[in-house]
């Protein structure tokens, strides 16, 4: 298992491929194509900083720009592979040592060294000046107050995300110019996974320090990925140029332009008219219409992300867990998959994925569809039909509004009076004025362990608890224990108990279905979709016919 590896992992994949890739000589005509990709959104936070933009749309955007020491194989099943580190080894239960690739260039031409890695994980860039390793609390306050950042001060969500990602990181030190060592305060079998997750992307120290303000940096970050930022227009477009000194070989595309096109119909019409080369987040019911045109095809599949309905247990009606249980039993999930997703995804085994390997809890299921049980639970809870608000965005997620309408009807049939309240952005979803009760969310796993999902998102430092929607003392105790437990059998038992609490006994959420993402493109472009939101546009995955 990746998380328990002790052996040195040899460099493969991109490194081997890059040796065979020629670089363009200065002055040689550049015949590489430029492409345009229409997306629903580029960034929710008006920034390109992974420590602030922890979102589905950010995951797609950042795959062009950033890289981690240990990467996920986007052309495989997201298994770990050497990235900016060519190899790594376990020193002990608290320590991992990594050997960096030599000759890796940042977008500004500087060579990446251990100094940049150490700075990436520093207080100045990640944890903030008040970082206390002995204090488990994060500093999360509000959500995506987009333009509130002053000077070089870190936005409050940056140290919160950093602490959530690395709750006990003691130090990162340079052993020599190309060797770094991560040391945790406590044992952590997931340390390699944390090093490879979104937010652990290596940045240029010089570029960060030279930026006049944090927002200047966050809108034009300098990293090592195959494409570099030329221009970012918030909520409009992102223009990227090929990073021709890229360590993995010359990128196959001269420039990539991502444009924000929120409406599905506009994205599809733009593709068919030749305005766009790729469009993202295509609803399944639109796939046949697109593929009637022989010039286009749609690729995609279920990904490592689940769609959820999330509860605020502080709402007077939802304070009784039986009401939240009734919500879960009133949902015919398979009907949603069959009708809105044309059977192209599935109802998963709760908030987990098979790539957890031995940590996957077999024989676990989502709550069964049982309207009679839902009605009985509501009767036992003495629910009288009071309205329950459901804050909703307009199709941030694929099929979001249609799914919400189906859910409201299913809940109505069970006796729940749920009222949709449309909101414009995530800040309005989370704001405390009025009564919060039900909202949409999706959860991914940043690496192959439950720590990266149920603990990171619903544990004591997770977003749901940090914004004050839900808490559970036993869940929090288990989360803290699982962070430091090294016995995999004990860890799995802890995870199973977390699922029982969060999905059955005191519901924090209920899983609707596994998410799926579908990308439509020109058929004369050879390209494959990955099992995640990230898009792979290195030379191994792009060619024009």
What are the functions of these language-model segments?
Residues 130-149, 350-354, 422, 427-484, ...:
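Acidic-aromatic pocket-rim loops
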Residues 322, 337, 413, 417-428, ...:
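Extracytoplasmic/peripheral linker and loop segments enriched in polar/acidic and small residues
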Residues 215-218, 244-289, 300, 417:
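Ligand-site clamp/hinge motif
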Residues 346-380, 394-401:
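Structural transition elements
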Residues 86-141, 181, 267-270, 317-319:
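Aromatic- and charge-enriched surface segment that lines or borders ligand/interaction sites
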Residues 519-545:
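Long beta-strand-rich cores associated with HINT superfamily self-processing modules
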Residues 38-92, 122, 220-223:
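N-terminal lobe/hinge region of extracytoplasmic solute-binding protein
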Residues 73-75, 156-157, 166-167, 177-178, ...:
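Gly/Pro-rich hinge or "lid" segments in bacterial periplasmic/extracellular proteins
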């Amino acid at each position: 298992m990746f998380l328990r590896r002790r052996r040195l992992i040899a460099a493969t994949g991109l490194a081997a491929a890059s040796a065979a890739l020629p670089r363009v000589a200065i002055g040689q005509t550049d015949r590489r194509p430029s492409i345009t990709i229409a997306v629903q959104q580029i960034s929710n936070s008006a920034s390109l900083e992974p420590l602030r933009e922890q979102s589905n749309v950010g995951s797609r955007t950042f795959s062009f720009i950033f890289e981690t020491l240990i990467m996920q194989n986007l052309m495989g099943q997201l298994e770990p592979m050497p990235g900016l580190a060519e190899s790594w080894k376990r020193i002990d239960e608290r320590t991992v040592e990594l050997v960096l690739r030599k000759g890796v260039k940042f977008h500004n031409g500087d060579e990446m060294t251990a100094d940049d890695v150490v700075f990436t994980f520093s207080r100045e860039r990640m944890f903030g000046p008040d970082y206390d390793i002995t204090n488990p609390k994060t500093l999360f306050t509000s959500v995506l107050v987009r333009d509130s950042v002053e000077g070089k001060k870190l936005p409050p969500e940056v140290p919160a995300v950093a602490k959530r990602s690395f709750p006990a990181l003691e130090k990162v030190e340079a052993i020599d110019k190309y060797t770094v060592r991560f040391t945790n305060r406590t044992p952590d079998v997931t340390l390699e996974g944390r090093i490879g997750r979104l937010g652990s992307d290596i940045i240029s120290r010089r570029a960060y320090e030279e930026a006049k303000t944090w927002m200047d940096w966050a809108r034009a970050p300098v990293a090592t990925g195959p494409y570099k930022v030329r221009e970012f227009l918030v909520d409009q477009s992102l223009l990227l140029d090929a990073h021709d000194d890229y360590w993995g070989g010359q990128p196959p595309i001269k420039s990539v332009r991502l444009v924000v096109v929120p409406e599905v119909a506009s994205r599809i019409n733009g593709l068919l008219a030749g305005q766009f080369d790729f469009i993202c987040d295509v609803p399944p019911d639109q796939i046949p219409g697109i593929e009637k045109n022989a010039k286009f095809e749609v690729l995609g599949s279920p990904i490592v992300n689940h769609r959820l309905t999330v509860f605020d247990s502080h709402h007077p009606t939802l304070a009784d867990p039986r009401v939240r249980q009734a919500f879960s039993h009133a949902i015919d999930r398979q009907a949603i998959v069959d009708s809105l997703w044309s059977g192209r995804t599935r109802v998963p085994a709760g908030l987990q994925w098979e790539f957890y390997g031995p940590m996957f809890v077999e024989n676990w299921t989502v709550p069964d569809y049982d309207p009679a049980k839902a009605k009985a639970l509501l009767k036992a809870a003495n629910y009288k039909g009071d309205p329950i608000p459901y804050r909703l965005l307009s199709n941030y997620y694929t099929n979001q509004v249609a799914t919400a309408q189906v859910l409201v009807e299913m809940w109505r049939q069970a006796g729940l009076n749920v009222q949709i309240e449309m909101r414009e952005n995530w800040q309005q979803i989370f704001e405390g004025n009025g009564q919060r009760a039900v909202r949409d969310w999706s959860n991914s796993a940043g690496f192959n362990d439950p720590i990266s999902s149920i603990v990171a998102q619903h544990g004591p430092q997770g977003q749901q608890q940090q914004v004050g929607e839900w808490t559970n003392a036993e869940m929090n105790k288990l989360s803290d224990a699982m962070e430091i437990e090294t016995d995999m059998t004990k860890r799995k038992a802890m995870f199973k108990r977390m699922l029982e609490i969060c999905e059955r006994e005191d519901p924090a959420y209920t899983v609707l279905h596994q998410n799926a993402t579908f990308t439509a493109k020109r058929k004369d472009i050879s390209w494959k979709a990955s099992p995640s939101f990230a898009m792979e546009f290195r030379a191994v995955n792009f060619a024009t016919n």
